A protein has these predicted regions:
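Compact structured core domains
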Residues: 1-3, 9-14, 19-22, 34
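Residue at a beta-strand N-cap/secondary-structure junction
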Residues: 23, 71-72
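Intrinsically disordered, low-complexity acidic/proline-/asparagine-rich linker or regulatory tail/stalk regions
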Residues: 111-124
Length: 124
């Protein structure tokens, strides 16, 4: 049953988190989980509230956000998180976050500059 597949779903999540930067197919995920493709999609959606593909995209976007926070370019973030091209990356990033990758990176840059402008509090 779908509710009995928690271990398989968690195994799939761990696999996605470890391999998000490369092309992952539903076939590959189902083999990792030891379930048919349809059983995996049903169990995953029931356990996580999203499809395995949507989960993969969320992991990729989360990692891309972390890279942008560190000042990595949008193009480099796209490549490092497994997107086939920058346009595809920008569309997904904007859909997930409400910001373009460039706008997100700029927000982090502005926040960093703000913190750098605050005088040091050397009280020790």
């Amino acid at each position: 049953t779908v509710s009995a597949c928690r271990v398989e779903v968690e195994r799939t999540c761990a696999f996605i988190r470890s391999h998000y930067a490369r092309h992952i197919t539903l076939e590959e995920l189902s083999l990792q989980a030891g379930l048919s493709k349809s059983a995996l999609v049903r169990a995953f959606a029931k356990a996580k509230g999203v499809t395995p593909y949507r989960y993969l995209m969320a992991v990729r976007i989360s990692e891309a956000r972390r890279l942008l926070e560190r000042g990595v370019s949008s193009a480099e973030a796209a490549v490092e998180t497994g997107f086939s091209d920058q346009s595809h990356f920008t569309n997904y990033f904007t859909a997930f976050t409400g910001l373009t990758p460039g706008a997100c990176r700029e927000l982090f840059r502005q926040e960093w500059e703000m913190w750098q402008s605050i005088p040091s509090l050397d009280v020790l």
